[in-house]
Amino acid sequence: NKILLYMKGSPDKPQCGFSQRATQILMACGKEFSFVDILSNPDIRETLPTVSNWPTFPQLYIEGELIGGSDIMMDMYQNGELKKLIDDVEI
């Protein structure tokens, strides 16, 4: 999955405001993305913050690289960086 969002809930039913904002940003970028609901996957919810060295969710990965959470996504979206990064991904 080249664009992967670890989030609370699903894009159709996000379970927190940050996850909702992250999915809205990704949808606005216009490319298909995958997601993992960490509420349904407690092992991932416990392990990923340690592995990624990022304590909160959502977490966006593009081509295996951690981009950040919803605040970073919003900043990058507003300045055009995120759309460019996503546009460069071949799915």
Label the model's feature ranges.
Residues 2-4, 51-62, 68-71:
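Structural micro-motif
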Residues 14-18, 36, 40, 58, ...:
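Short amphipathic alpha-helical molecular recognition features
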Residues 1-32:
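Local sequence-structure signature of Cys/Sec-based thiol-disulfide redox active-site neighborhoods
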Residues 6-8, 36-41, 54, 63, ...:
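Structured beta-strand/turn binding interfaces of compact recognition modules in eukaryotic regulators
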Residues 27-47, 55:
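Thiol-based oxidoreductase modules, predominantly thioredoxin-like and allied folds used
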Residues 62-91:
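Non-catalytic, surface beta->alpha helical segment in thiol-disulfide oxidoreductase systems
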